[in-house]
Amino acid sequence: SLTGWQTESFYYYAGMCDKFEGRLIPSEVPNMHNYLKWEPFGVVALILPWNSPIGTLIWKLAPALAAGNTVVVKPSERASCSTLELMSILEEADLPEGLINVVTGYGTTTGIPLIEHNDVRMISFTGGTKGGSAASLSASKKVKPIIMELGGKSPQLIFKDADLNLAVNGVVSGIFPVTGH
């Protein structure tokens, strides 16, 4: 079930918290060494799509927190309620104030200003190609890293000999069952 893997995601990334450590990388140059040090970005913006808003939130939230970041979540204006409900549940977990924040609104009036905010150091965006293009352009203005997943709608091939009713059912259930509507 979705609830099961979402819970497992939190446990998995909670187990990663103490795995982010530096390491010495050998160098062939005398008297020189390379050191890899993992550091949190600080504030990470998580911008969510309308379809599977909770699933996408967990995929983004758990690793961002495990890496030591604070987050600002911007759910889709078409599916904000499930995110807001999860936040009210997380408030009961006695998390530090300001660790997880939510802003709602449209991409142009809320998402773009969030991306361009000076305190936001990294963006994780899932949505359509038009929104992704605007998000990427805004992030590039401030030279901020952005991770994007754009327009995935479970494409499928349906062959001539396929059971059409079963195929249509599969296509629809690949997109809509956890959309937050």
Task: Annotate the PLM regions.
Residues 1-21:
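Long amphipathic alpha-helix in the N-terminal Rossmann-like dinucleotide-binding domain
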Residues 10, 68, 100, 123, ...:
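Residue-level signal for inorganic ion chemistry
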Residues 23-97, 121, 143:
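Conserved small-residue-rich beta-alpha loop and adjacent elements
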Residues 33-34, 101-124:
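A structured beta-alpha segment of the ubiquitous adenosine-cofactor-binding alpha/beta core
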Residues 63-65, 114, 138:
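Hydrophobic/aromatic ligand-binding patch that stacks against planar heteroaromatic rings
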Residues 69, 74-76, 104, 126, ...:
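Short beta->alpha connector loops at strand-helix junctions that form conserved
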Residues 73, 79, 104, 147-148, ...:
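Hydrophobic residues in well-ordered beta-strands that form the structural core
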Residues 122, 130-181:
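ALDH superfamily catalytic-core signature
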